[in-house]
Amino acid sequence: MTVGVLQLELSIPSAFSLKDKRQVVKSLKDRIGHAHNVSVAEVGALDEHRRSIVAVAMVSNDKRYVEGALSKLVDYVRLDPEAVLQDYQIELL
């Protein structure tokens, strides 16, 4: 069994309040979760309106599948017009 964790550090330049940020983050979390069958949560920078840290988790019996799927998720997030990907980390357990 392989557990993959992807941590995304995002910048949200269009957010002028926490409400604006939450709309962008919720939309991104919903799209990621529904399209890729993963668990998604905002885990950091909760009180900063222009920054967010989002974690994505996935479990599979195939290590290569998890690594590939999380890499594709990084590419998917890079295409988001409202959230700018600043950094990411993939960890396989």
Spans of model-derived segments:
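Short, charge-patterned binding micro-sites
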Residues: 3, 41-62, 91
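C-terminal binding/interaction regions
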Residues: 21
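Amphipathic alpha-helical assembly/interaction segments
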Residues: 17, 27, 31-33, 37-44, ...
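Short glycine-/aliphatic-rich beta-strand segments at the starts of folded cytosolic domains
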Residues: 4-13, 18
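A generic structural signal for short beta-strands and their flanking turns/coil linkers
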Residues: 2-6, 34-36, 50-54, 84-86
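C-terminal structural segments of small proteins and small subunits
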Residues: 58-93
